[in-house]
């Protein structure tokens, strides 16, 4: 699960842990953040307390080498990958004039490119799983202008994730790999 050190990713991990799942926490947060609770290590402790097995890994999903190393560690520790949860996301609810290009690149790099990179790296292992899935935390692609108006850069980055789901669901269907999106809008 990418971005599972806190928030929705950690909540998904804790729910899976109650079913005894093996969970890789792939996130950048190894040290406590001054404003946001949770690290990969606190999440791992909570997962194990809930009944799961955890492998906390520092992974910046924008970095192909870190993604590849994380996937290799997951396979070595747990013997394979059955499901990938693309949860990591960068958010900036700002308009065009208020969004620096560095922030735009961050959102595109994490949300869209990072999800693509993680799916690509997990694909060989998903092909050999008994019931493989890719679950991406992404909204339904609704082109109503109201969803773009106040934060076009963020919406584009999240819709990139949505389009990955649509495309990869069709691409991977013959392989028996289910690809779905979940958008918990009532939580966010």
What residue ranges belong to the model's regions?
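Short-chain dehydrogenase/reductase
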Residues: 1-78, 91-92, 102
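Structural signature of the Rossmann-like NAD(P)-dependent dehydrogenase/reductase core
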Residues: 1-2, 86-89, 132-139, 178-183
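A short, exposed helix-loop element centered on a Lys and neighboring polar residues
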Residues: 119-120, 166
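Catalytic loop of short-chain dehydrogenase/reductase
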Residues: 127, 133-174, 185-188
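Substrate-binding pocket helix/loop in short-chain dehydrogenase/reductase
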Residues: 95-96, 100-105
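A short helix-coil junction within the Rossmann-fold of NAD(P)-dependent oxidoreductases
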Residues: 19, 77-78, 94-95, 121-130, ...
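Short SAM/SAH-binding signature in class I
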Residues: 82-83
């Amino acid at each position: 699960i990418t971005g599972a050190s806190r928030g929705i990713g950690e909540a998904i991990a804790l729910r899976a842990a109650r079913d005894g799942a093996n969970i890789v926490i792939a996130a950048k947060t190894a040290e406590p953040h001054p404003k946001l609770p949770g690290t990969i290590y606190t999440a791992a402790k909570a997962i194990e307390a809930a009944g799961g097995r955890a492998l906390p890994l520092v992974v910046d999903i924008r970095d192909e080498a870190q993604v590849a190393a994380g996937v290799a560690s997951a396979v070595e520790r747990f013997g394979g990958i059955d499901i990938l949860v693309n949860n990591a996301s960068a958010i900036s609810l700002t308009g065009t004039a208020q969004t620096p290009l560095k922030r735009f690149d961050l959102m595109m790099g994490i949300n869209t490119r990072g999800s693509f990179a993680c799916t690509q790296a997990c694909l060989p292992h998903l092909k050999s799983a008994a019931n493989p899935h890719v679950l991406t935390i992404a909204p339904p692609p609704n082109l109503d202008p109201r969803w773009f108006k106040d934060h076009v850069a963020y919406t584009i980055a999240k819709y990139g994730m949505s389009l990955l789901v649509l495309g990869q669901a069709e691409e991977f269907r013959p392989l028996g790999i289910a690809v779905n999106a979940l958008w918990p809008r009532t939580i966010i």
